[in-house]
Every structure is written in C-alpha cells, then in structure tokens.
Swiss-Prot record:
UniProt family annotation: Belongs to the class I-like SAM-binding methyltransferase superfamily. Erg6/SMT family.
Function: Unable to convert squalene, botryococcene, cycloartenol, zymosterol or lanosterol to mono-, di-, tri- or tetramethylated derivatives.
EC number: 2.1.1.-
Sorted UniProt keywords: Endoplasmic reticulum, Lipid biosynthesis, Lipid metabolism, Membrane, Methyltransferase, Microsome, S-adenosyl-L-methionine, Transferase, Transmembrane, Transmembrane helix
Subcellular location: Microsome membrane
Gene that this polypeptide is encoded by: SMT-3
Protein name per the record: Sterol methyltransferase-like 3
Membrane topology: Single-pass membrane protein
UniProt GO molecular function: sterol 24-C-methyltransferase activity
C-alpha cells in the first residue's frame, strides 16, 4: 500500500528532474556537496545537531533521537505499522496501543526537523487573512483557540500534544497564563526547550515528555486545555479525551482543532480513500476519524459540547488553509525540497534510508491539498468542550 501511494506522487518529481539541464544539475550537485561537506565537518554544527540546539535549515536536519544505524529498521517498521482494512482505508488498528504510541514517536523523530525547516515551529495549518503573512496567520489561529478555551492571566493551562512548543509559547505570552506542554517525543522536548530558552519564556512555558493518554499530573490540576492538530495522533481518541477530562478542574474548557473527514467524504469513492490513506500515513495518524465520531466520543467521556465547526470554512475572505501546500507545489519546493534531502542522504549527511520516509511525507503534500480542495478533509475542525461543574 505504501509503495502504491508513493508511486502516485513520486513520478512527477522524476519528470521535473528531467527538465533540469546537465550544467544546472552539475552546478547544483557540486554546490550541495561542497556546502554540505563543509557544514558536516563543522564541529559546532555537529554538536548542535546532536544536542537538538540547531537553529533550523536544510543542513540542520537529523532523524531526531534515532541513531543513524537504526533509521532503516525504524522507517520500515513505521511503514509496516499500517494495513488496509476491508473498506480500503489504511489504519493501525491491528497493532497494540503500545506499538501505536511507538509508531507516532518514531514519526516525530523522523519528521520534526523537516517540519521546522519547511514549515515553522508551529506544526499546524491556518487560514490567512488577506492583510496578513503566514507567521501572523499562525499566531491568529493559535490565539483563537486560546480564546475559545477561555484562557485568562495566571491560569494553569495544558497544551495537549505540544510539538516543539510554539503555540504554547505564543498563548502563554499573549494571555499571561502558565502553559505546560506534553509531547511523547524526547527530541521534541529538546527542541522545545531550545526555542523556549532562546525566547526567554522559561517562566511561562514548560515542555514535558509524556503520553497525552497517560500524563503524570494529579486530578483537577489545570484551569484550561487546548490542542492543535494533535489528538488525531491518539491511538484511541477516547483515551486522550478521558485523560484531559481527568486533569481539568470542574468547569474548565478544552478547545481544540482536529484533523477529520468532512461530510463530503465518501468511503465508497476510491479517490477519496486514496487521498485519506496518503494523508494518514504521511502525517503519522493511526487512522482518520469523522467529525461526528469526535463529537460522540467527547460526549461519552462526559464533556459538554459548546460548539463544533470547521474553522477552514468560517470565512469566505480568508485564504484556504492549504495555501502553503499550493505554494510548495507551484514554486517547485515540493519537488526540489525532497530532492535536496535525497542528495544529502546520498553523500552521507543524512542516513541513507531516510529517503524512504521522505517519499511518504512528500506524497502527503499533494494528497492533503487535494483533499482540502475536494472538501473531504480539514485539519482544523473546532471542538469546544467543558468539564461540568461538580454538583453539590
């Protein structure tokens, strides 16, 4: 199945490469080898790569906390974690919860530096106002979820699936709240600490390595919680909802954006299923849920639903959330970005079989964009939950 998904999208990369003239290719390869070799042999860069304190960029890419010799085995195990169900949809339902957690952890080891290089330190989409740039749109997107969670100065707030922490730092800075972010991935904690120290926000934001379905916090600890495109990585959604419910104080709000299929998704439409399969594996999700399933699970856990809607369709004057993916494709970055990484793998700057993972991730650029245009998927369906007040 993985090879089929890759074959759908990789041929255009090959065709684009054929259009490059020999002298352009030779110049590019020579420059890349020279620069790559110079930077690779720089002691300071090697130290930064090892400690997770590099400031991003193509030559700061690593495989996270994975040892170079283990990359091949873990990339293969990541791909093999997925199987096709009877309805044609790709899931990890056949593996144990522990294996699913490990699969997601491996995904973040492999993808974190790529996200920081190609995207930014906020690992999410946003709809851009006409007057704003991408960075401003990201902040606005984060601030909306903070408002929906009713975050106030001095509150203790949980960031559920913090990544490298930029949304948590933004919300802490703007609200005056104390934000604790949890991520399953040790390398992301390193990166979050690096960015937090650099921003001098240690007193406002703290990253913690923990499984968001089994956190180390006491019952009724937090005044609010938020999640941005994170709970779609939970092996079972009810597990993370139950845990957030447990650690929230009575009356507290939990607001989140989640990746879900929309009413237009037709499980009998072969193209729809292909797009969702590429989206699932390309983003390290155990499966793809519908917005209705998310609503039902939250209610079963005990939350009160205050609102749910697709933020991607909230305003007609905003640029679509897949705009940056469109830019990647139109500018050629979706082709020359992966090609550059493959070159670095070829010369030994990155683990050789890291390229297998790049093919999977690159395919999702095209699938996610098309799914957005078809109106069958959104990464920003809003759910605003409240833990009921205790009754006397």
């Amino acid at each position: 199945m993985v090879s089929e998904l890759v074959s759908m999208y990789v041929p255009p990369i090959v065709e684009a490469a054929k259009a490059v003239t020999p002298w352009q290719a030779a110049a590019g390869v020579t420059a890349a080898i020279f620069i790559g070799s110079y930077l690779w042999h720089s002691a300071s860069l090697r130290k930064q790569r090892r400690t997770g304190t590099a400031d991003g960029g193509l030559f700061s890419l690593t495989a996270g906390g994975i040892k170079k010799q283990d990359v091949t085995k873990l990339v293969d195990s990541f791909s093999q974690a997925y199987k096709t169900e009877d309805d044609g949809q790709l899931t990890c339902h056949h593996i144990t919860r522990e294996q699913s957690v490990e699969m997601v952890n491996t995904f973040y080891d492999l993808i974190t530096d790529l996200y920081e290089w190609a995207w930014d330190t906020s690992f999410h989409f946003s709809c851009r106002p006409r007057w704003a740039n991408f960075a401003q749109a990201q902040v606005l997107h984060e601030w909306r979820i903070a408002n929906l969670a009713n975050i106030q100065p001095g509150m203790k707030v949980l960031d559920v699936g913090t990544g490298v922490g930029n949304p948590g730092r933004t919300i802490a800075s703007l609200s005056g709240a104390q934000v604790t972010g949890v991520t399953i991935n040790a390398y992301q904690v390193k990166r979050a600490l690096h960015h937090t120290r650099k921003a001098k926000l240690e007193d406002f934001y703290k990253p913690v390595q923990a499984d968001f379905t089994d956190t180390p916090f006491e019952d009724d600890t937090f005044d609010a919680a938020f999640a941005i495109e994170a709970t779609c990585h939970a092996p079972k959604l009810e597990q993370v909802y139950k845990e957030v419910y447990r650690v929230l104080k009575p009356g507290a709000y939990f607001a989140l954006y989640d990746g879900v299929t929309k009413p237009n998704f037709d499980p009998k439409n072969e193209r729809h299923v292909q797009l969702m399969n590429a989206t699932v594996i390309g983003n390290g999700c155990p499966d793809m849920r519908t917005w209705k399933e998310c609503e039902e699970i939250g209610k079963e856990v005990g939350f009160k639903l205050h609102m749910s809607y697709d933020a991607g369709e909230a305003s007609r004057v905003l640029h679509p959330w897949w705009e940056k993916l469109d830019n990647f494709i139109n500018t050629g970055f979706a082709w020359y970005g992966p090609a550059s990484i493959k070159l670095l793998s070829k010369i030994g700057f990155l683990p050789r079989d890291f390229t297998k993972f790049i093919d999977i991730a690159a395919a999702s650029v095209f699938s996610v964009k098309e799914a957005g245009e078809l109106g069958i998927f959104t990464p920003m369906y809003v759910f605003v939950w409240q833990k009921p007040e205790k009754t006397a």
